[in-house]
Swiss-Prot record:
CDD domains in UniProt: S-100A10 (cd05024)
Self-association state and partner proteins as the record states: Tetramer of 2 light chains (p10) and 2 heavy chains (annexin II).
Protein name in UniProt: Protein S100-A10
Taxonomic source organism: Xenopus laevis (African clawed frog)
Function as written in the Swiss-Prot or TrEMBL entry: Because p10 induces the dimerization of annexin II (p36), it may function as a regulator of protein phosphorylation in that the p36 monomer is the preferred target (in vitro) of tyrosine-specific kinase.
Amino acid sequence: MVAPSELEHSMEKMLLTFHKFAGEKNYMNRDDLQKLLDSEFSEFLKNQNDPMTVDKIMKDLDDCRKGQVNFRSYCSLIAGLLIACNEYYVKHMKKR
């Protein structure tokens, strides 16, 4: 059996991370999202000056306005952060 590629391993890690914070209910509420951000994106939060950052992220991700972040919305969060990181990389790091 072939070992998973690095990208496949990363995808599995993102999937497992979502379920770690969502639990059996298969979505994250605001508290779950806060725990995820504190645990997995602490550097990102540290650089935010707005105390409402988590509430704004929750509002952006909560498509149905039920106070829930589903897996699709979580993927949107990850994709948005990856895009921002890529833009930074292209602008600052790649030029070195």
